[in-house]
Design a protein with these regions (language model features):
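Short, compositionally biased leader-like segments
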Residues: 1-19
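N-terminal "arm"/small-domain region of PLP-dependent enzymes with the aminotransferase-like
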Residues: 13-75
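Short, small-residue-enriched loops and turns at beta-alpha junctions
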Residues: 57-58, 85-88, 140, 161-162, ...
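Conserved N-terminal alpha-helix of the aminotransferase class I/II PLP-enzyme fold
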Residues: 66, 71-113
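Conserved PLP-anchoring active-site segment centered on the Schiff-base-forming lysine
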Residues: 121-140
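Short, structured coil segments at secondary-structure junctions
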Residues: 128, 148-150
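Active-site phosphate-binding strand-loop segment of PLP-dependent enzymes
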Residues: 154, 158-198
Length: 198
């Protein structure tokens, strides 16, 4: 009888081999203190954070910290349920209204993480009989959102406008199409030619 976890043995063996050969365990890095949006004390040493998601440097902004403390005082440490179950917090409505107005849209919706946004939106919008045309180097969360739904996924070569147009041209007339691009590709750091692609 096979154990459910047997399939992980090759990965375990590889990791143990790397460690035995003097490789460093990537999970041994401990961040003891964050000093700034780009620096922390890791394993006792000051370290530059090259993989941070702190894109706008707001984690140490005094106004953001004060608002976070106030939100904890007003609402506690969590919503204790979904919007459908418990309702929507006034702060969520306020930020969605501000985003809607700023971008000149009919509606805006916030998610806790970008990953959740991609999961929640993509498979909801594109379903059976629809097509998702996306850059091959899109973030894993985008791919996961595509996998959750029933739409046909059609990838194209990274940042290649001609390849994208060719894929779009092959989609049946009348089918729903969702084109997914990233403004800045988080995995590569390069920028999509959005003006030309839209």
């Amino acid at each position: 009888m096979s154990d459910l976890f047997d399939k992980f043995q090759p990965i375990i063996d590889l990791r143990e081999g790397l460690l035995a050969a003097g490789g460093e365990d990537p999970f041994s890095l401990v961040m003891e203190k964050v000093l700034s949006p780009t620096q922390a004390i890791c394993n006792g040493r000051e370290t530059i954070l090259l993989g941070t998601y702190n894109y706008m440097g707001m984690t140490f902004d005094p106004d953001v910290i004060a608002a976070g403390k106030q939100a904890l005082d007003d609402f506690g440490a969590g919503t204790t349920g979904s919007r459908v179950l418990n309702g929507t917090y006034s702060g969520h409505r306020a930020v969605e209204q501000a985003l809607k107005d700023f971008f000149g849209m009919d509606h805006a919706m916030v998610f806790s993480t970008g990953y959740q946004a991609n999961l929640g939106i993509i498979y909801t919008i594109a379903g059976k009989g629809d097509y998702i045309v996306l850059d091959i180097d899109s973030h894993a969360s985008i791919w996961d959102g595509c996998k959750m739904g029933d739409a046909e996924v059609v990838p194209f070569k990274h940042n290649d406008i001609e390849a994208m147009d060719k894929r779009l041209g092959r989609i049946p007339e009348g089918a729903g199409k969702l084109v997914i691009l990233e403004g800045v590709y988080s995995m590569l750091g390069d920028i999509a030619p959005l003006k030309e692609m839209i």
